[in-house]
Every structure is written in structure tokens, then in C-alpha cells.
Amino acid sequence: MTTLFLRGCAAALLLLSFGVQADAIRQTKAPFEDKFRQLEGEDWPTPTDYRNAAGAPGYRYWQQQVDYDIQVRLDEPSKQVTGAETVVYHNHSPDSLPYLWLLLDQNRFKRDSMDNLSRTVSGESISLGQVRRAKRYQDWEGGFTITSVRDGNGRPLEFTVVDSLLRIDLAQPVAGNGGSTQVHIEWSFPMIENKVVGGRSGYECFTDKGQDGNCIFEGAQWFPRLAVYSDYEGWHNKAFLGSGEFTLEFGDYRVALTVPADHVVAATGELQNADRVLSAAQRQRLAQARDATEPVFVVTPAEAEAAEGGRASGEKTWVFKADNVRDFAWASSRKFAWDALGVHQAGGDQPPVMAMSFFPKEARPLWDAYSTKSIAHTLKVYSSFTFPYPYPTAQSVNGPVGGMEYPMITFNGPRPVKDEKTGNLTYTERAKYGLIGVVIHEVGHQYFPMIVNSDERQWTWMDEGLNTFLQFQAEKQWDRDFPSRRGEPKDIVEYMVSQDQVPLMTQSDSVLQFGANGYAKPATALTILRETVMGRELFDRALREYAQRWYMKHPTPYDFFRTMEESSGIDLDWFWRGWFYGTDHVDIALDQVVRWRLDSGNPDAEASWSRGEYQKEPPSLTATRNTGKTVVETDPATRDYYDRAERFAPTASARRKAKKDDAALSPEERRARAVSDSFYRFDLRNVGGLVMPVILKLTFSDGSDTVVRIPAEVWRKNARQVTWEYVTDKTLTRAELDPLWETADADRGNNLFTGTIATRTLKIASPPKQDNRMREDDLKVLPDSLQTYPAPSKD
């Protein structure tokens, strides 16, 4: 029992001693947030043989190809589209595929679609447009009707419709590494009235008082299309909910569109049977446009108005061919005038691109003046940043859709307005610049994502953000004072400090404040990256590298991030983390500026400086107001050495030490000690949390100024507060952060420091003294041996 008791006491003492030791060595850690930690291995996927670590396609990269042969008919009275397609699916993946997934995006307009049933509402009011839409769904329903699915031999195939997706089970799996299969599908759907139901396609009929009742039809997502099968996700079979757009494979198309005989058709690709659908005069004008310097009408406004006056009884079939495109869209109307202009690209080794616009009389004169010229301008600017435009046409169509893009064709909305009372035709400044801007934007989408084929349904910013950035560049090259809505750093501040933000890397259907998030913020981020972080030369080279690497391929965000870093040689993980993965904003405050002067090492000079600083101070208010004499003034016996000696006079000991210290300096150290420059120290505080370069404009007493660009790495050891130093022989009078408003700083009220700058003295730090036991023990060695010998001290 005694033994156990003693053992217990010993154990308790042992534990107590460990506890005391633990308390003694407990580590205290400073708060630290590493805004510069690497994304590689943390948030980015591991590189593979398909996508390498440099951001380029790997040596085993593959992608599928899907070819379509489609016959489609538009029934104008019923607004019904009926079609049949033969699909050839080429499987370049290493996987055998027993079934195919297709997109039925028109199924979004079924009453029981996931999109319709998952819509939410808020507030205590409702727009009349919402009321009209709700009423329309009571007696109308959209969506595909699939009437037949057969294989290449005509045998029926089993299929399943899952909301906006179609799964086709193949009789035999399509083999990987080059296998192919053929599928034939027949289908139909009712076109939506775009102004009532909304969406990216549909029809618009001119039925108001005084209008002719004719319609414009814009066809998009109008046929079952193959979903993407990729190396990083397999089948991209996410339902269409409206916001997240499209993820599609490249392929070759032949499309025959049967429409009323007096319609004019615009479509993806090149018209194959102009001799059957255009008059000889129209064909001649189309040929003239190839080398014209101004747009040429192919179908004149007079011809369009004549067609509007009567309804043809027959039909015509327009045949189009498009190679290596990811989608196909069309527009059809008897209201269309059509102008064209050949755009000759830099280098001159390619045929001209036919920039063409299709518009009703209600769009004139804005569209004749600006649409086709905006297309030509877009091709010039975007190609200078990326690659030559590879397709034969680029088209802009005016109709019910305000702005939407498809290969070689775009739908754009702005028009003039006619006064209901006077009939006068006018247009607003917003309509003018809105038309130019939307044409630039939608035609710009030919590059992103029609050619650099990103996954729109997953990452909105990859096409909308990149495209809006280039749109901003094109707008400023159209007119220096172009009223751009997105791209200027100052214009993103309101969003950056707003509530309910989500990171740019959020999946498209979950994005809040869609326009600001998917368009404006990434466009601004890229503007800042180009103008402030990387510089134009490095940025432009890296962006071009990305565009050319992923030309006609499927990039991911990580391919973009890696390419921008690998090409430029700049580590940008901090930038991607802040702008793309987070919701912090930019707000850097200049809290304090202090001038520091070097301690000269001369006691008399230092005394003189201290005396001068003291004399600048006001006397004690209390001492000044006291009227009676002090004890020291009335009693001489209280006055001693300290009363008689001048307060700042150096002592004899100080002078001796200074002389000794000076004698110990090397010539280089003595020159450094004699520097009379000012060391200005700036206290910077990161209020917003987003680390950014610090742009500092310094103004001096002689009227000169300079701008210092401090890289974002200044925050790498403390992301919240740092002190930065600037050495000059000039006198600083003013300091301002972000003088050109280039960083999207949210609070300019804390960016300026003016007025009196306090001066303090920097003491010269002595180098650390190294222990030398041999010297302290009065010993020495000789050059030829480690043997020690006596070395009596001379002290």
C-alpha cells in the first residue's frame, strides 16, 4: 500500500513537472493569413496527360466530334418547328460509351420543368411581364416532342427524357479511340413568344396599331444536341435552368431550312444554294460587298418592304454548311433588309470575312449606320488579342432577343423609337451605344466561347468575363469617350462592397447579381491585371497564348490560370484567390507618414537638431498661465548642474564614444553614415481584405512628383498592415494612394495624406556581436597552423 502511494505521488509530481514545463514553453502564434499560398495542390486539380501543369492541352488530349445533317421546317401560322436530324458521333475518348446524352434545352419551357418549378419570388409587387408569362403558361406549353429515335440502320433505340436531357441507349457501345455511331432523331416544338415567355430564342410579331403583323423568328437550342463528354467530368449532363448557358462539342453541320418563300434567312455557316433563294441582283450585290469599303445592301429596304406587303403562298429551302462549329442558330423573316461588308484580316492570306446584318425597317437608321461596321471593328480588335477569325461569316440580327451569341450569328436588340402621336423617329444615346456595345459583345463571343470552347454552364466568367474585358478594349478603340458600362475599375466598387456576393468560381445557376458577377467583376479584374499587375506586354502575350493553346478546344479555369502564370513568369495565385475565389473588396488606407532622418553619429549635430525640434513645440500652457515665481527662480540653493547645463548639450563621454565609434567604421560605413536623405515610412492598412499592388503618388516641395508602384507581395508577411519605406533627398508634402483610380479602391477618403509630416531619428543599429572565445581567452593562431599561442590583451 505504501509503495503504491509513493508511486502515485511520484507520478503526480512527474505530471506536475511536465505541466509546468508545458506552460513555460507554450508557443504564442501571431495571427497570420497567407494570401499568397499556392493554389496548386489545394484548389486546383492535379495535372494529367490530358491537361498539363503549364495550362496547355496534354500530349494525350482528346475531345469528341459530332456531325449533324438536319432538315427543319418553320410553319409560320402555328409557330411550330419540325425537324429530323442524323447525328454521327465520333468517340475520341479512351472510353467505350454504351449511351449518349443530348440536350433538350427547349424543355425548359415545359410547365413542370426543373427551371419553372424551382423559380422563387420575393417582395410585395409583380411586374405586368410576370403576369403575362404566368397567364401564357395556363394555355400554352413549350418543349420538345421526340417522335422517333433510330440507329444508322433504322432500328428503334430506347431513350429516356430527364427534364432538359435525353439519354439514348445504343444497341452496341461506341468504341473509344476513334469509334463512331449514327443516330437519327425526329422532333418538333412550338417556338416561344420571346417578349412574353423570355429566353434566348423565339418570335416577335409586329401587331401594334399601324404595324404590318409580320414576324421575326430566331431559332436557337432548336434541335437535340449532344452533350459534352470530357476528360475532367465525363458526361456534362446538368439540366438547363436558364442562367448557366451551354457546353457543346465541335462538329460539321449541313442544315436545310424550309421557310415561307418570301422570307430571308440568316444562319450559322455559308449559304450553299444562293442561286435558288436569291435573285440575280441580290447575288451580284453580295459579291460586290466582299471588296467594298462600306456596307452594301444585299436585300434592300425597298425589297423588304415589298415583301412585307404580301404573303407568299409557297416555301423555299435555304441550305447552309458550317464546319468545326459547336452549335447552329438561324433567323427568318420577310421583314429583313440585309447588308454586308467584306472584312480583310491582317496578313491577307485568308478570304474576307463577310460581316452581315439583318434587320427590319423598325431598326433603321441605327442598324444601317452601326451594326455591320461594329462587326468589322470587333473582328479587328479581338483578332489582335487572340488569333485570326477562322469562319467565313459574322452576322448580327435584329429581333426579339436583346443579345445572344451562336457560331457566326448573333441576336441583338436595340432600335430607334417612333412617337405614337407624331410618328417622329428618334433614338437615345443609350440605344446608339447600346447597339454598338451589344454587337461588339455578342460578336466577340465568337472567340469566347464559340472558338475557345469553355463550359458556360459551369463557369459564367470564362466566356462572359473574358469577352466583356475585350469588349471594353474594343469600345475604347471605337471612341475614347465610349460610355462603357463594364471594365473601368471605379465602376465595380459598388458591387464589390455590396451584400449577397458569391465568388466568381460559383456554378452559373447559383450566381447572385449575375451581370456584376459574371460580366463586370471578371472584366475589371482582367483590366487591372493588364494595366496594373502584369503590364500590357506580359498580359497580352499570356492571353494570346491561352487563346491559341485552346483554339477549338475545351479549357477549364485552371488551364487559364496556369497559362497566364506560365507564359508571363508571374505568380498570380494571390490574384486568383482574391478576385476569383473570394468576395473581399479593395480598400487600402494610408494611415500615417513619418519622415525619419539618420542619426549622424555627431553628438553636437544631434544636439542642435533636437534643440531645434524642441523649440518648435509650444510652451506648457499651465506654466505660461502661472503668474507667480517658481521655487527654482526664488531659491538659488535649489539650482544645480542640471539647471545650469543646457538640456541638449552633449556630454564629454558622448563625444568620446562617438569618436571611438567613428574610428571603427570602414570607409563604406562612414559614407553610409553621412547620408542626409530622408527615410519616409508609410503605414498602410488593408481595410478591404483583398491584397493588391500599392500605387503611391508622392509630391515634393519643389513641385515635382513621382508614382511608385509597389507590388502586391508587400503584403505577403502581413496581409492586414505593413510599413513601407521610401528614401529621397527631397521634402515630401503630399502622398496619395491609387491616384489614377486603377485598383477599384472602395474608399478614397483614406487614400490621401497631406499637411505636417512628423520627423523622427533613426538610430544606427550595431551589427550583432559574435562570440569569440579564443580572443576572449587571450589566444591566437598563426596562418600556417591551428596551434594556439598566447595573445595578451592590450586593454
Question: Where do the protein language model's features map onto the residues?
Answer:
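A surface-exposed beta-strand-loop module
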Residues: I25, Q71, Q80, H90, ...
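Solvent-exposed beta-hairpin/edge-strand motifs
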Residues: L97-G154, D262-H263, T699-R709, V727
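Short, hydrophobic/aromatic-enriched beta-strand segments in well-ordered soluble domains
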Residues: E85-V87, N91, L104-Q106, G179-E193, ...
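Early extracytoplasmic/domain-onset interaction patches
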Residues: A24-L103, A525
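Beta/coil-rich, acidic/histidine-enriched accessory regions frequently appended to metallopeptidases
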Residues: P77, R549-D795
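Hydrophobic helix-coil surface modules that form long, contiguous segments used
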Residues: Q221-W235, L241-I440, F469
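Hydrophobic alpha-helical and helix-loop surface patches within well-folded domains
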Residues: V20, F32-A53, V66, F320, ...
